Amino acid sequence: MSVVVYAPASIGNVSVGFDVLGAAVSPIDGTLLGDRVLVELGSEAFTLATAGSFVDKLPENPKDNIVYDCWCVFSRELNKKNVALKNVHMILEKNMPIGSGLGSSACSIVAALDALNQFHDNPLNDMELLALMGEMEGQISGGIHYDNVAPCYLGGLQLMVEELGIISQEVPCFDEWYWVMAYPGIKVSTAEAREILPSQYRRQDVIAHGRNLAGFIHACYSKQPELAAKMIKDVVAEPYRERLLPNFAKAREYAASAGALTTGISGSGPTLFSICKDKDVADRVSRWLQENYVQNNEGFVHVCRLDKQGSQVTGSKL
């Protein structure tokens, strides 16, 4: 018996919701922009192999890999429930660049924990599993946050509420939007990107942030795409982080001139996203970003839609 789970890329913050909004995305051409994890019966308690486009960026020692930590916390939770743990052999297919702003660590965490749960006949419910995912994300970035793992696992546009036992809930978004994702091929550390943020904010910035986020959520629920796009502004992180992203200002300027609704930093960067309301504009922006924002062979641009499914079982073989 074996199971393979695919976990998609995600946009943390979506500019307007620092640490409280996240969106899962998938390329419209069918490319798998995300990680896959296989779990099968093993001869020992835990063994791990690695594969994929970015396998050379992973630690050599399996016990230094986040997938091992996922297995440890999953084992801990099963012990609490008196559920027997099976011996597992796991394979992480690492297709997501590390430090990309695409929720790379979330992809590995979500795929690993979802696959382990599926392999053991789902002893943990969605919120229990999501809590573990946030714990693992915190281990990497220095603080528990769900804005990548929640959309990666549950799909769609997710708002972190963290009340009444609910970690996140889906917010209705706009099916007609194209999300152009451009990764330049360089790395930005999440921890480094957090360190450059100020420890305190001016009152007018706090007010603007509250207005933008409330306005965006209102526009999503009242089905006003133009207003929603206008409210996607970042006064919390982007003014400080954009200097970490070469050509970001030029890219945003070009995208606006080409007809994009808005452009922002995905997570802590260096990936950016541009939202477009029609395919022609998305293709035009995509071509420009490929020629002017991508810096090396590891970079890429994808035209995406919101991924409403999140992580999913794709079969039993990689």
Swiss-Prot record:
Segments traversing the membrane: none
Family the entry assigns: Belongs to the GHMP kinase family. Homoserine kinase subfamily.
Entry's EC annotation: 2.7.1.39
Lineage of the organism: Bacteria, Pseudomonadati, Pseudomonadota, Gammaproteobacteria, Vibrionales
Role summary: Catalyzes the ATP-dependent phosphorylation of L-homoserine to L-homoserine phosphate.
Entries under InterPro entries matching the protein: GHMP_kinase_C_dom (IPR013750), GHMP_kinase_C_sf (IPR036554), GHMP_kinase_N_dom (IPR006204), GHMP_knse_ATP-bd_CS (IPR006203), Homoserine_kinase (IPR000870), Ribosomal_Su5_D2-typ_SF (IPR020568), Ribsml_uS5_D2-typ_fold_subgr (IPR014721)
Reactions catalysed, as given in the entry: L-homoserine + ATP = O-phospho-L-homoserine + ADP + H(+)
Localization, UniProt: Cytoplasm
Gene Ontology CC entries for this record: cytoplasm
Keyword set, alphabetical order: Amino-acid biosynthesis, ATP-binding, Cytoplasm, Kinase, Nucleotide-binding, Threonine biosynthesis, Transferase
Pfam family, one: GHMP_kinases_N
Residues where ATP binds: 97-107
Top-level enzyme category: transferase
Any one Gene Ontology molecular-function term assigned to this protein's record: ATP binding
Organism listed in the record: Aliivibrio fischeri (strain ATCC 700601 / ES114)
Protein name, entry field: Homoserine kinase
GO terms (BP aspect): threonine biosynthetic process
